[in-house]
UniProtKB/Swiss-Prot annotation:
Chain ranges of the ApaG domain: 2-126
Pfam families reported for this sequence: DUF525 (PF04379)
InterPro entries for this protein: ApaG-like (IPR050718), ApaG_domain (IPR007474), ApaG_sf (IPR036767), Uncharacterised_ApaG (IPR023065)
Protein name: Protein ApaG
PROSITE patterns in the record: APAG (PS51087)
Signal peptide feature range: none
Length: 126
């Protein structure tokens, strides 16, 4: 199967940060670790990101910014970059999705989708 020139594989894992949360104040904080891999055939640089964060009440926040954690990773084909960040929502359950904006070495801009993933506190048995 022939690879596409402009393609970024994105995987995300989220965990609840109990020590940084304040349920009594409706603040639930989650860390998420993103692993991105250039699965295309052309080197590319990450320019920006767009996140859509939604809580269980349907409140949606859009976060748009340059780079990720202060960096603009440059990825050759087959190279990966990983980072961890955090988000706080007002409910114990929510979700995030979005996209990364990149520019390939040949000048072609492209967007890589970030599939929706859950933000959820672990269930407890009493």
């Amino acid at each position: 199967m022939r690879r596409k020139p402009y393609e970024l594989k994105v995987e995300v894992k989220a965990v609840y940060l109990r020590e940084h949360s304040r349920p009594d104040a409706h603040q639930y904080t989650f860390a998420y670790t993103v692993t991105m891999e250039n699965t295309g055939t052309v080197p590319a640089k990450l320019l920006g990101r767009r996140w859509i964060i939604t809580d269980a009440n349907g409140k949606t926040v859009e976060v748009v910014g340059e780079g990720v954690v202060g960096e603009h990773p440059y990825l050759r084909p087959g190279e990966a970059f990983e980072y961890t960040s955090a988000a706080t929502i007002a409910t114990p359950v929510g979700s995030m999705h979005g996209s990364y904006q990149l520019i390939a070495d040949d000048g072609m801009p492209f967007e890589a989708p970030i599939a929706a993933f859950s933000l959820a506190i672990p269930r407890r048995l009493h």
